[in-house]
Design a protein with these regions (language model features):
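ABC ATPase nucleotide-binding domains
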Residues: 269-301
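Helix-to-loop junction immediately C-terminal to a conserved catalytic motif
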Residues: 72
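ABC-family P-loop ATPase nucleotide-binding domains
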Residues: 108-164
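H-loop/switch region of ABC-family ATPase nucleotide-binding domains
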Residues: 223-224
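The feature captures the beta-strand-to-loop junction immediately N-terminal to the Walker
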Residues: 57-59
Length: 301
């Protein structure tokens, strides 16, 4: 069982479908997630095609990390279906293709042996493991890992130990690891967490190149900060809480002052999604949203 009550499933089923279905990297259909009796997420629908660059955006505590667990094969829904790279969550061995999914997340960072060399942590993406164990890697593998470390400004970390890294250093190691195996689906959960201004801008510059690349790789960047969205990402799924009659329907499953379940309230392009009115409603605060020089920002009014 993973943190937050998510149980990792080991099985997937292969999907047979139309050419349109074969172009889909990720699809969530009426997904609901419950922890004990409480409904955390409900009516979550999302379709990400190959080659698309998405931002999953929303406040803290809305359920973004729970969705990341499902999208990365490390958790499954209470109801609904999750299809990943042509496989349905819940039915086929995930370890045969988990290395096709690149993941960077704080929870994954805690899974490595404390004394692991960051360079070794990066190459383990090729075997979808969190430690070298008995696996062997080639000189070419290490050369690629070192190239990624240079791109994100952390080449000086080679030879150090994971448990001695700062939060920002560990975050950049995990981004490098997520890119190491040239994944078909790349999931970056809060990729600038713990970075200072310089480190953040280095990371965003590198991630902008990921957003601009022309390939079949689908990318999902998860964040709650507008200013940390790199250029090149042109789709957004905005999360909020269900309201009105829908919220009333879940009242029995909301204990005390617990909030209403989270869901996706908007999918589409960033320009139509990131409006002052919409984000004010999502965050419960009057906000002014701006966009200049390819970067988004928001402030209270």
């Amino acid at each position: 069982m993973l943190a937050g009550g998510i149980i990792a499933s080991k099985w997937f089923v292969k999907m047979e479908g139309t050419m349109n279905e074969q172009s889909i990297a990720l699809k969530l259909d009426d997904v609901e997630f419950r922890r004990r009796r409480r409904v955390i997420l409900t009516k979550v629908n999302l379709e990400v095609k190959k080659g698309e660059k998405w931002v999953l955006f929303g406040p803290n505590g809305i359920g973004k990390s729970t969705l990341v667990q499902m999208m990365s094969t490390r958790g499954f829904p209470s109801e609904g279906t999750v299809d990943i790279l042509g496989n349905r969550l819940g039915k086929v061995n995930v370890f045969s293709y988990r290395n096709r999914i690149g993941l960077s997340s704080a929870e994954l960072g805690r899974a490595f042996p404390p004394q692991e060399d960051p360079l070794d942590a990066i190459v383990t993406a090729l075997t979808a493991t969190t430690g070298r164990w008995r696996d062997t890697y080639t000189d070419e593998d290490y050369a690629k890992a070192r190239s990624l470390m240079r791109e994100f400004g952390i080449e000086y970390l080679e030879g150090k130990m994971m448990f001695k890294l700062s939060e920002g250093e560990r975050t950049r190691v995990l981004i490098c690891r997520a890119l190491m195996a040239d994944p078909d689906l790349l999931i970056l959960d809060e990729p600038t967490t713990g970075l200072d201004l310089g480190g953040r801008e280095i990371a965003l510059r590198a991630l902008s190149r990921v957003g601009a690349e022309q390939s079949d790789r689908a990318v999902i960047l998860v964040t709650h900060r507008l200013e940390e969205i790199p250029q090149g990402f042109d789709h957004v799924a905005i999360m909020g809480r269900i309201t009105g009659n829908e919220a009333d329907a879940y009242a029995d499953n909301v204990a005390g002052n617990d909030p209403a379940p989270g869901t996706i309230v908007y999918t589409g392009d960033l320009g139509h999604g990131f409006t002052s009115e919409r984000l004010s409603q999502v965050f419960g605060l009057d906000l002014k949203v701006t966009h200049a020089n390819g970067r988004w920002n928001a402030y209270a009014v």
